Structure formats: C-alpha cells, structure tokens
Regions:
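Extended alpha-helical interface modules used as scaffolds for assembling large macromolecular complexes
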Residues: 1-4, 9, 13-181
Length: 181
C-alpha cells in the first residue's frame, strides 16, 4: 500500500464498495485519496494555457502525454541516482517540513497520514523542478498540492478520523429524529 496513483474513474472507491454491498474502511480512504476533478477555474483545469476550451486542452494534454509518457521519469531517476543518498535525506526532511506546514490545527491521524502523502508529492515535484526535470517555476508543485489538499479536505468535510465523524453523525441523526418526543 505504498503506491500513489491517479484514476480517471467516475465512481469513487466508496461508490464501488457500495455497489458490491460493502463499506470502505478509513485506512482504504487514506491510501486511495480521492480528489474531486472539478476544482479548477475551468472545471478540471485551473488554466487552459492559451487554448480555447477545456476539451481542446484535454485533447492536447492527452496527445502530449501519449507521446512523452515516461520520458521525464527516466530523466528524474538518472538525476536522483547521481546523488541518491543526499536526495533521499533532503526529501525526508522536506516531506516532514511540508507535512507540518500543510496540517491544519486539530487534524486527526487519518488526515495526517493523507497529508504525508500530499507532502511526498509536493517534495518530489519540487525536487524534480530543482533537478531541471519539470520546467516549472520553483514552488509550483507545492502550490498544486495545496489546491488538491484544499479540495480533498472540503470533499471530506471534517478534519477528524472517519469513525469519530460517523459517531457524531449518528448522534446528530438520533437527536434530530427524536427532538420533539
């Protein structure tokens, strides 16, 4: 479960589990962080980079990804291998620093674990930028992670652990249902 992945699935993990008559566990939701895709200024995208619309941008992005798939990974791995020990040490420190910076006051353990994953993405992206792999300005990976984290937290609806939030929701439901009895 040490994987990070993206999915273009239209159904959430919770939806898939429900269709099989199951429920998701809190740990599953922390390992498979679901970020809503319509968090940008243009639906799924924040910028269209001079293109006329989201569809044109999406088609161009897909074509470029198909053509360039994997090329930056090789460059990144080669750059990392040049001084793996120093890069690993720096990444660990950056992940810790970024996670502390991103973690809201009162966040539960599950949110903290998810934020560690966001911090990993930010730190790896910033390192890739410093190594000349991305072509992005410094700080862009962290900015993008902040956008995704904000969307994830808003979608989640609370900072606590899932079990605690479920208990509170049950109590609220009971009080609401029996408030006039």
């Amino acid at each position: 479960w040490r994987l990070l992945f993206l999915s273009t699935g239209e159904l959430s993990l919770e939806d898939h589990a429900a269709s099989a008559g199951q429920r998701t566990q809190a740990g599953m939701e922390v390992r498979t962080i679901q970020i809503p895709s319509d968090t940008g200024h243009h639906g799924a995208f924040e910028w269209l980079h001079g293109m006329e619309g989201g569809r044109t941008f999406a088609d161009t992005l897909k074509a470029n990804a198909d053509h360039q798939h994997g090329t930056t990974f090789r460059t990144y791995v080669e750059a990392l291998a040049g001084d793996l020990e120093a890069h690993s040490e720096r990444l660990r420190a950056e992940i810790k620093r970024i996670a502390a910076e991103l973690t809201p006051q009162g966040a539960g353990n599950q949110v903290g674990r998810a934020i560690n994953r966001f911090a990993l993405v930010a730190a790896a992206g910033e390192l890739a930028t410093r190594l000349g792999v991305t072509g992005w300005p410094e700080g862009e990976a962290l900015r993008a992670v902040r956008v995704c984290l904000k969307a994830w937290l808003a979608e989640r609806g609370h900072l606590g652990n899932k079990e605690d939030a479920a208990t509170l929701e049950q109590v609220r439901g009971f009080v609401t249902a029996h408030q006039y009895t």
